[in-house]
Amino acid sequence: MVNGPAELRRKLVIVGDGACGKTCLLIVFSKGTFPEVYVPTVFENYVADVEVDGRKVELALWDTAGQEDYDRLRPLSYPDSNVILICFSVDSPDSLDNVLEKWISEVLHFCQGVPIILVGCKSDLRDDPHTIEALRQQQQQPVSTSEGQQVAQRIGAADYLECSAKTGRGVREVFEAATRASLRVKEKKEKKKKCVVL
């Protein structure tokens, strides 16, 4: 990915509903393989080197549990974050609703001033006939790009991106956008606005 040692270090925390695609996104980006078996995460850390705009950055990737059982444990991952990815799954409109109903308030509580990237995961399922039919039976449909963009605007996200960890489409762009957002904030405010757990 990057030649030579990274000049800068940044911490990225990824949150969102359980099974929305967070861990697959991190593993595909950091290790280049797609995990075929779903194992709920408690806490996992990965490291990846990213080069954006000629700058080498070591990105510490903090994976978190989306399940409610971990609501009291998850805030331990927020301190010193430089950028937050809030994820939802394109095949789960409920997971997008939860961005507004749960995730944004948690992130803003613990990470005031930290840039947020909204990420629509599993974008390959938007056109998948089985997914479309399963959602139709529940009077739902896959989340559209414009719906994702509207939520990103409502929560004040620095960016909105979609990706498919399964096909690899858009994965690198998510982390490049996140890295850029973390660098912009640092340049604007060297006071280092970081997450605080109260």
Swiss-Prot record:
Organism domain of life: Eukaryota
Transmembrane segments: none
The family this protein is said to belong to: Belongs to the small GTPase superfamily. Rho family.
Binding site for GTP: 16-23, 63-67, 121-124
Gene Ontology CC annotation, any one: extracellular vesicle
SUPFAM superfamilies, sorted: P-loop containing nucleoside triphosphate hydrolases
Membrane topology of this protein: Lipid-anchor
Identification of the protein by name: GTP-binding protein RHO1
Motif (Effector region): 38-46
Positions of post-translational Cysteine methyl ester modification: 195
PROSITE patterns per record: RHO
Source organism of the structure: Candida albicans (strain SC5314 / ATCC MYA-2876) (Yeast)
InterPro entries reported for this sequence: P-loop_NTPase, Small_GTP-bd, Small_GTPase, Small_GTPase_Rho
Keywords, sorted A to Z: Cell membrane, GTP-binding, Lipoprotein, Membrane, Methylation, Nucleotide-binding, Prenylation
BP GO annotations: (1->3)-beta-D-glucan biosynthetic process; actin filament organization; negative regulation of phenotypic switching; regulation of actin cytoskeleton organization; Rho protein signal transduction; signal transduction; small GTPase-mediated signal transduction
CDD domains, sorted: RhoA_like
Lipidated residues (S-geranylgeranyl cysteine): 195
Compartments reported by the entry: Cell membrane
Record-level Gene Ontology MF annotations: GTP binding; GTPase activity; protein kinase binding
